[in-house]
């Protein structure tokens, strides 16, 4: 019984070489065809400014000029696409400026979006009945936490939205989302 390993390795046959070339060609062609499809399906990373700030956009991803929001009557809650595309309420103040605090339209119970009810002066979640005060604090559960807030600034005619990292003015504590 010969337990020795053959010294010579078998050479690649013509058939194996052609199979390898065919497989490599198919793989390269498929990769070249799928790359543009992948780029189309995956949203590009949004460019952010200092501190993660972005420009407020509409539902189509177009920048919203500050003059458009400020033309609304005082106490209007304008819904824009904010950080990471999250729907965010901007509030027009009595002096026709924007409040420096924006509210993210995302219920802290199960993540539903909700409308502002001007008659009751509350945000009311239709999913499970949570209610929020105009500043985003919880009026009635089951929501366990106040709404996430963001910083809002107007520079020239652009609305900048950036993450809120300071003390939460509603609770006096570190924000729960930081």
Curated annotation (Swiss-Prot):
Q: Which CDD domains match?
A: Rieske_cytochrome_b6f
What the entry lists under InterPro entries is as follows: Cyt_b6_f_Rieske, Rieske_2Fe-2S, Rieske_2Fe-2S_sf, Rieske_Fe-S_prot, Rieske_Fe-S_prot_C, TAT_signal
Which UniProt keywords are present, listed alphabetically? 2Fe-2S, Disulfide bond, Electron transport, Iron, Iron-sulfur, Membrane, Metal-binding, Thylakoid, Translocase, Transmembrane, Transmembrane helix, Transport
Q: Which Pfam families match?
A: Rieske, TM_PetC
Q: Which cofactor does it need?
A: [2Fe-2S] cluster
Transmembrane residues, as ranges?
20-42
Domain Rieske as annotated: residue spans: 65-161
Indicate yes or no for the key word Iron-sulfur.
yes
GO CC aspect terms: plasma membrane-derived thylakoid membrane
Q: Name one GO molecular function term.
A: 2 iron, 2 sulfur cluster binding
- How would you describe this protein's topology in the membrane? Single-pass membrane protein
What EC number(s) would the UniProt record show?
7.1.1.6
What's its catalytic activity? Answer: 2 oxidized [plastocyanin] + a plastoquinol + 2 H(+)(in) = 2 reduced [plastocyanin] + a plastoquinone + 4 H(+)(out)
Cofactor comment text: Binds 1 [2Fe-2S] cluster per subunit.
Q: Where in the cell is it found?
A: Cellular thylakoid membrane
Q: Name one GO biological process term.
A: photosynthesis
Assembly with partners or alone:
The 4 large subunits of the cytochrome b6-f complex are cytochrome b6, subunit IV (17 kDa polypeptide, PetD), cytochrome f and the Rieske protein, while the 4 small subunits are PetG, PetL, PetM and PetN. The complex functions as a dimer.
- What is stated as this protein's family in its record? Belongs to the Rieske iron-sulfur protein family.
Question: What is this protein for, i.e. what is its function?
Answer: Component of the cytochrome b6-f complex, which mediates electron transfer between photosystem II (PSII) and photosystem I (PSI), cyclic electron flow around PSI, and state transitions.
Note on file? The Rieske iron-sulfur protein is a high potential 2Fe-2S protein.
The molecule here is called: Cytochrome b6-f complex iron-sulfur subunit 3
The species this protein was found in: Nostoc sp. (strain PCC 7120 / SAG 25.82 / UTEX 2576)
- What is the gene called? petC3
